[in-house]
Every structure is written in structure tokens, then in C-alpha cells.
């Protein structure tokens, strides 16, 4: 990439936007736009399933160079929330980088029912592209289902594609959606018996040599080792007992207790995929991110590059072992060390004060409901099968037809419009009838129709969150809200997806060039991140952005 962004201008005189430096012009001359006031590299870090209280709960175990460095030298938004439902990985990553909600960017879940094809679709799935780096279908992915731009896209447009964008994550959606539509590359990890970083023909026809070399280096193999706690387990007083009834564990091991021999357990746990559910998946991601910076020469000139890194292992560990486990505590202690290692690398290769980082999460997580029950806190599990059977009987009795329902998924009901029309029924009346039926069901807290979502302007409460997550083209006809602390999940491990604070309240840290030192308890929302970074860079906001730049964060 060039050190200066070269533009051709005519008679006009321009003065710079604050972050772009000074522009000197003359008639029909080549103009050098100095961009040294902008960071050389923006790194977006998403920690999958990180609740805000993990920053404070494990604080005594963190070193000075990871999370604490961001807090002590950067800006801490202590009351940052997702402003929509559902709080899943796909929508979370899309919302962080596009500056808007599923209502606009269209990623309404990890998977959803497509009303046109009558099939379930995956948020990053794309059968029109081919896998690169594997013969497995795991590479048939792209960002095409995301309907708006990311700030990384806008940076590519602003720099005439001279600023690079690369996305990295163990999860495909965690790499693809943040990097946007114009990324140079997105890479994700394919486990099983391969243990390799792969991509898609959306970005390239073959892996670059540095990725091939990394895959051949046996980096993944090196982490198939014993996982034990970093410190003496007796000092892990911020979490529950190591042996309890609330954790899943790994196949091939009777108890979900330390230590874990990953090499031995890998055979019964999908080979290299076992790494995803350990902190070593985060370490491998860090290794690969640093290799990308070196090989792609990111941040080596004055034209801003963007690197998106999503740490997925925290989510896998949380789902498996739960919020209160020793395993989740050790995972965050180790992630803190990986962050310190990563920041030190950025200091050495980009230069201290020459890069900007933000760190947040794509959603939080609920405490294991069975654990909450043991603490006398109201919680439980949904019997979706029984609810669906009861509801289908109602529909058949009410409308004398068993084909009105096409799909039930993500707490939404999709109706068969063709059948409803053929019966001469009014769609709005059918929806409202179902709302009145479902609201009487046990463990259902609220129910809304698509008609209500599209004709009523909600500004507060779960209704506003649902509306921000409702996409008229893609969402269902009836939307259910389960009773608080009731989930559709196994009785071990944790999950997420609700509009409650345990799922919406996540960290938001800014650090590096152009960032003030401070903190705020004023409420901020996730869509504010992208326009804040855009304002820092002096570029256009993402085209669907509804967030507000956090001016108090920027110097």
C-alpha cells in the first residue's frame, strides 16, 4: 500500500476533516493526503459470550497488560448493552460492525427460516461459492446475507481499497460478518481431522502461502495437550466447585473436572474441534492473528488497515461448562494473557500509540438455570416439544386445517400464507388469534404479532428490543418471549438469546490512538461502536448505521 493516498482534484480548495491531516491543492494537480493522524491499524476484538461482570469478577487474576491495560490506559463504557433481541453470535457480530440492528442488517439469527425458499438458512452460508483450503463444505461461506455495510467496508471505500481488511475467528460467522463485503480475506478454523485455517472463493481461489505455512507448522497440534488451571485451583474462589451437577464436560471423561488430556479426549470429541472448547482455541487465534499482521504487512503505512478478531472459545466453554465454572474462570485468565501477548506484538510491529483497539462481546450468557434453582432463584427449562404439540392442536381445532404453520424456530412462528389465503382467512386476525392463545401458556411471558411489530412504535422495554430485532422481510408472523430465566437448552452448561441484562450487558473498551482515558456509566448501545470508529477515522458511517458516535471516547 502507498504511504500517501493520491487524489486528483480540480479548482476547489479543501480543508481537512479533523483526522485526515492537511490537504494542499492546486489546479489539476496531484494531491497528497497525509493520513498520519489516523491509526495505522484498527483492531476490533469480539470476545464471544463475554458478560460485563467477567471484567470485574476475575479482576484479581488479570495481569496489567491485557484487560487492565485497556481499562487503565483507554476508555471503559461500563453500561453497554445490546438494544435488540435475539442476542446470538451472528446478529451480535453484524451489529457491532454495521452500527445497526437485525431490523436493518438482516442477520436475524445464526440460522433462520427463509420464507421464500421454505428452508432453514445459515447467516454466513453461501452455496454459490467454494471452500478454499479444504474439500469440506465448511468453506462455502460469504457475507452476502448481511444487507448493510460495515465500518471496514467504508474504510475500504474511503481508501480506494488501499486499506486492507482481514477477519479472523474460529467461527466462520465471527470472521466473515465483521470483515464485511469488501474484505481482502476472512479466515476461520476447520477442526475435525484437519486442524486448518480455511477460507472461501468469495475472497480468493487459493490460500496464500503464509496460511499454508501456518497450517503446516502444526500449531494446532501443539495445543492438543493437558489443560489444567494456570494457578492453583484452590485460588479460583471467584467460581463454583470444580465438581458439580451443572456442567457438560467432554465425551470420554466421566467427570467435568480438571485436568483434561486433550490429545486423549480428541478422538471422541471431533478431533481438533476439541480445541474450540478450551482456552487454547483463543491462543491459536492469537497466533494466527499475529501471523496475519506480519504476512499481510498490516499497519505498516499511514493508510488505515482493519483487522477483526473474534475469540470464539469463550463461547464454547461457556455453553459446555456454564458461567460459574472453574473452566470459564481459567479461560478468561488465559485470554487475558493472550491479549497481553497480542498487545505487546502490536507495540513491537505497529508501534505504541499507532493503533486503535476496541473490545466488546457479541452477547452475554445466563447462569445455568438448574444452578439458579439451587439458589432459590426462579428459573427453568422450556418444553418446546410439548408446547408445539399443544399449539398445533389448537390451530387445527380453530381453523380446521393442520397446514397453517410452516415453521417454528428462534421463538417465532412462520405461517403458510398460501393456505391462509386459500381458506379466505385474514392474516392479521390469524396472527392475533395465535397471540391470544399462546399468552395463556405456561412459561410464555409475552407474545406479539408481526402486525404489531410493523405498526406500533415501541421505545422502551422488551417490546423495543424485539422491534429492533424484527426484520419485516425475514422474521416470523408471531414472536414469543419466554419467561425470564427459562431457556431451551440442556440442564448443564449455559446459553443466551434473551433481552435480559445477563445477555445484553457486555464490555466495551476503547484503547490506543485517538482514544481518551476515562470511563462512563451512561448507557451506550452496541450500534454506537461502528459510527464511533468511523468518526475516529473520518470516514462515512456504515450505510445502515443507526448508532450514535461516542464523542466522549475520542480525543
Spell out what each predicted region is.
Residues 1-33:
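Bacterial Sec-dependent N-terminal signal peptides
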Residues 23-75:
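Active-site-proximal N-terminal segment of extracellular/periplasmic enzymes that hydrolyze or transfer
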Residues 39-51, 70, 96, 155, ...:
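Beta-strand elements within well-structured catalytic alpha/beta cores of enzymes
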Residues 55-104, 164-168:
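Short, structured active-site-proximal loop/turn typified by the sulfatase FGly-forming signature C/S-X-P-X-R
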Residues 62, 79, 88, 110-140, ...:
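Secreted, luminal/periplasmic, and some membrane-associated catalytic domains
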Residues 77-95, 167-175, 310-312, 361-364, ...:
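Short, solvent-exposed turn/loop segments enriched in Gly/Ser/Thr/Pro and often Arg
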Residues 101, 109-303, 312-319, 440-442, ...:
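His/Asp/Glu-rich, glycine-adjacent segments
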Residues 386-425, 495-537, 554:
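Substrate-binding rim/cap in mid-to-C-terminal beta-strand-loop elements of soluble/periplasmic
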Amino acid at each position: 500500500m502507498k504511504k500517501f493516498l493520491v487524489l486528483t482534484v480540480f479548482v476547489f480548495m479543501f480543508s481537512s476533516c479533523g483526522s485526515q491531516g492537511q490537504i494542499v491543492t492546486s489546479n489539476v494537480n496531484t494531491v497528497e493526503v497525509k493520513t498520519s493522524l489516523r491509526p495505522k491499524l484498527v483492531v476490533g476484538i469480539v470476545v464471544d459470550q463475554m458478560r460485563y461482570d467477567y471484567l470485574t469478577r476475575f479482576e484479581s487474576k488479570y495481569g496489567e497488560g491485557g484487560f487492565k491495560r485497556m481499562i487503565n490506559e483507554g476508555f471503559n463504557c461500563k453500561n453497554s448493552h445490546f438494544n435488540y433481541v435475539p442476542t446470538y453470535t451472528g446478529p451480535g457480530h453484524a451489529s457491532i460492525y454495521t452500527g445497526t440492528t437485525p431490523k436493518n442488517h438482516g442477520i436475524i439469527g445464526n440460522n433462520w427460516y427463509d420464507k421464500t425458499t421454505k428452508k432453514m438458512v445459515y447467516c454466513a452460508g453461501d452455496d454459490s461459492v467454494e471452500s478454499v483450503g479444504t474439500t469440506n463444505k465448511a468453506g462455502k461461506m460469504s457475507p452476502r446475507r448481511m444487507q448493510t455495510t460495515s465500518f471496514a467496508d467504508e474504510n475500504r471505500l474511503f481508501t480506494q481499497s488501499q486499506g486492507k481488511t482481514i477477519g479472523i475467528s474460529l467461527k466462520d460467522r465471527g470472521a466473515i460478518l465483521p470483515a464485511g463485503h469488501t474484505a481482502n480475506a476472512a479466515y476461520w478454523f476447520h477442526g475435525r481431522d484437519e486442524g486448518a485455517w480455511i477460507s472461501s472463493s468469495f475472497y480468493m481461489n487459493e490460500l496464500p502461502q503464509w496460511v499454508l505455512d501456518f497450517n503446516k507448522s502444526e500449531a494446532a497440534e501443539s495445543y492438543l495437550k493437558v489443560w489444567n488451571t494456570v494457578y492453583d485451583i484452590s485460588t479460583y474462589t471467584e467460581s463454583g466447585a470444580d465438581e458439580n451437577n451443572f456442567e457438560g464436560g467432554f465425551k470420554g471423561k466421566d467427570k467435568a473436572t480438571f485436568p483434561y488430556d486433550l490429545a486423549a479426549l480428541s478422538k471422541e470429541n471431533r478431533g481438533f474441534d476439541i480445541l474450540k472448547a478450551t482456552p487454547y482455541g483463543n491462543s491459536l487465534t492469537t497466533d494466527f492473528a499475529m501471523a496475519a499482521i506480519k504476512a499481510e504487512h498490516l499497519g505498516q503505512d499511514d493508510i488505515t488497515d482493519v483487522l477483526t478478531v473474534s475469540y470464539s472459545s469463550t463461547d464454547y466453554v461457556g455453553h459446555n461448562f456454564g458461567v460459574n465454572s472453574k473452566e470459564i474462570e481459567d479461560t478468561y485468565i488465559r485470554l487475558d494473557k493472550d491479549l497481553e501477548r497480542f498487545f505487546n506484538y502490536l507495540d513491537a510491529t505497529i508501534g505504541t500509540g499507532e493503533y486503535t483497539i476496541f473490545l466488546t462481546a457479541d452477547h452475554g450468557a445466563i447462569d445455568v438455570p438448574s444452578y439458579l434453582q439451587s439458589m432459590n432463584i426462579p428459573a427453568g427449562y422450556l418444553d418446546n416439544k410439548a408446547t408445539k404439540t399443544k399449539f398445533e392442536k389448537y390451530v387445527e381445532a380453530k381453523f380446521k386445517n393442520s397446514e397453517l404453520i410452516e415453521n417454528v424456530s428462534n421463538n417465532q412462528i412462520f405461517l403458510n400464507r398460501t393456505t391462509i389465503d386459500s381458506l379466505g382467512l385474514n392474516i392479521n386476525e390469524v396472527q392475533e388469534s395465535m397471540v391470544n392463545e399462546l399468552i395463556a401458556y405456561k412459561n410464555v411471558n409475552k407474545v406479539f404479532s408481526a402486525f404489531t411489530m410493523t405498526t406500533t412504535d415501541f421505545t422502551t422495554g422488551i417490546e423495543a428490543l424485539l422491534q429492533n430485532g424484527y426484520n419485516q422481510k425475514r422474521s416470523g408472523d408471531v414472536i414469543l418471549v419466554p419467561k425470564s430465566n427459562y431457556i431451551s437448552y440442556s440442564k448443564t452448561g449455559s446459553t443466551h438469546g434473551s433481552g435480559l441484562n445477563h445477555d445484553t450487558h457486555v464490555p466495551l473498551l476503547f484503547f490506543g490512538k485517538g482514544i481518551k482515558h476515562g470511563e462512563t456509566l451512561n448507557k451506550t448501545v452496541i450500534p454506537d461502536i461502528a459510527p464511533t470508529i468511523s468518526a475516529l477515522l473520518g470516514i462515512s458511517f456504515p450505510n445502515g448505521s443507526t448508532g450514535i458516535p461516542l464523542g466522549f471516547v475520542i480525543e
